[in-house]
Amino acid sequence: MSEKEIWEKVLEIAQEKLSAVSYSTFLKDTELYTIKDGEAIVLSSIPFNANWLNQQYAEIIQAILFDVVGYEVKPHFITTEELANYSNNETATPKETTKPSTETTEDNHVLGREQFNAHNTFDTFVIGPGNRFPHAASLAVAEAPAKAYNPLFIYGGVGLGKTHLMHAIGHHVLDNNPDAKVIYTSSEKFTNEFIKSIRDNEGEAFRERYRNIDVLLIDDIQFIQNKVQTQEEFFYTFNELHQNNKQIVISSDRPPKEIAQLEDRLRSRFEWGLIVDITPPDYETRMAILQKKIEEEKLDIPPEALNYIANQIQSNIRELEGALTRLLAYSQLLGKPITTELTAEALKDIIQAPKSKKITIQDIQKIVGQYYNVRIEDFSAKKRTKSIAYPRQIAMYLSRELTDFSLPKIGEEFGGRDHTTVIHAHEKISKDLKEDPIFKQEVENLEKEIRNV
């Protein structure tokens, strides 16, 4: 693939993973200049954006690049102005343009601090009511790996600080023991490496790499749902590490019991230690995050502008910091001082037309389950008793009506059921709605509640 084709694919995947605001503000107009010696040089016309992408999104883009090109590539975002210096350096010291060898890639799986964002430490983590317990648990684990809580399972929505805490744990462990072997990875990357090890007949090297360590930090574990072989491999990796008193830290967007198509033996192991959840920051925490950010960056922003951002952006920390960066870029490009009016103008696309919360199948299962007294896990179970089967059909019907997910995807979230089962459920509930006005009112009430989640 050409650089253009590679980056088009990266942007396509990134658009699905990032919020619309983050994608359009920071990543949309970037361009891949070259890939050389395991590094992807990516151009951004705005200095603020280049710095922000290196700090906050390099890890996500690195994982996507791995999926697209099939080997480890570290993204480095530079401005178009910096490109001249880069080109001069390349001319002075020409480098070989070969793909990294397998040996180099494998050796780089344990990279110490290079795995972690230098900014993501416990010192830079702003504590508030929504994250105080996860922070305390993470610090306890970092102080005494495998002695406090093992595993530590952190869950919460996107951009709330789960990855920050995992990086902070990694930094702290290495502060106390520079020789510790620490791996930070995502379950998606773990899966891709596992598949590659099978393809290249390198299973033993893969197992050695992940089992001969002191701390495993694995992000977004929900990605392994429905991946039977990956779950089995991770099960044995988990057992090996746990039995040898090695620390395991796991993050997810939902608690273990709500991860569909996760083997019971893995689910139970995830629940062995401590499960903590991170919730969106309150106003005071949002203000503290913004104030800390401007102190770190030595920025001069009036308090009323920060107050406006903190009041308007309530979803997560990533969106909050993204709004601040957007404001700085807007002010710089227009050459105008930052005021409340300019802040409102810079963020008008976010504020005036907020993207409504996307309804998930998990939202539907939760509301329907509460109404009919059905546990979340029962929606994925094989049970066919009417007290469970009928609410399951209602949830399938609502999933088709209220989401854009495909029939196979809906079936997957209900225990891996075939798409024809979803069609049958939709047809049956549609028929019952026409025949029973009381039932119709019941389902309409459920729909309203789901839309208000």
Swiss-Prot record:
- Region annotation Domain III, AAA+ region: where it falls in the sequence: 115-331
Residue span of region Domain I, interacts with DnaA modulators: 1-71
Q: Which InterPro entries match?
A: AAA+_ATPase (IPR003593), Chromosome_initiator_DnaA (IPR001957), Chromosome_initiator_DnaA-like (IPR020591), Chromosome_initiator_DnaA_CS (IPR018312), DnaA_C (IPR013159), DnaA_dom (IPR013317), DnaA_N_dom (IPR024633), DnaA_N_sf (IPR038454)
Q: GO terms for CC?
A: cytoplasm; plasma membrane
Q: What is the effect of changing residue 195 to A?
A: No strand separation in vitro, does not oligomerize
- What is this enzyme's catalytic activity, as reactions? ATP + H2O = ADP + phosphate + H(+)
Leading EC class: hydrolase
Instruction: Output the Gene3D superfamilies linked to this UniProt entry.
Output: 1.10.1750.10, 1.10.8.60, 3.30.300.180, P-loop containing nucleotide triphosphate hydrolases
UniProt keywords, alphabetically: ATP-binding, Cytoplasm, DNA replication, DNA-binding, Hydrolase, Lipid-binding, Nucleotide-binding
Give the binding site residues for ATP: 159, 161-163
EC numbers for this chain:
3.6.4.-
Tell me which PROSITE patterns the record gives.
DNAA
Query: Does Transcription show up as a keyword for this record?
Result: no
Q: Name one GO molecular function term.
A: ATP hydrolysis activity
Does the record's keyword annotation contain Coiled coil?
no
Q: Where in the cell is it found?
A: Cytoplasm
**Gene Ontology BP, a term:** DNA replication initiation
Q: Where is this region: Domain IV, binds dsDNA?
A: 332-453
User: Region Domain II: start and end of each range?
Assistant: 71-114
UniProt cross-references to HAMAP family, sorted A to Z: DnaA_bact
What this chain does, per the entry, is described as:
Plays an essential role in the initiation and regulation of chromosomal replication. ATP-DnaA binds to the origin of replication (oriC) to initiate formation of the DNA replication initiation complex once per cell cycle. Binds the DnaA box (a 9 base pair repeat at the origin) and separates the double-stranded (ds)DNA. Forms a right-handed helical filament on oriC DNA; dsDNA binds to the exterior of the filament while single-stranded (ss)DNA is stabiized in the filament's interior. The DnaA box is 5'-TATNCACA-3' in this bacterium. Strand separation requires the DnaA boxes and adjacent DnaA-trio motifs as well as ATP. The half-life of ADP-DnaA is 1.5 minutes at 37 degrees Celsius (in E.coli the half-life is about 41 minutes); it exchanges very rapidly for ATP, DNA with or without an oriC region does not stabilize ATP-binding. Melts the oriC region in vitro (open complex formation); melting requires ATP (not ADP) but not its hydrolysis.
Record note on domains: Domain I is involved in oligomerization and binding regulators, domain II is flexibile and of varying length in different bacteria, domain III forms the AAA+ region, while domain IV binds dsDNA.
Query: What NCBIfam families does the entry give?
Result: DnaA
Similarity comment text for this entry: Belongs to the DnaA family.
* Self-association and partners: Oligomerizes as a right-handed, spiral filament on DNA at oriC.
- The entry's protein name is Chromosomal replication initiator protein DnaA
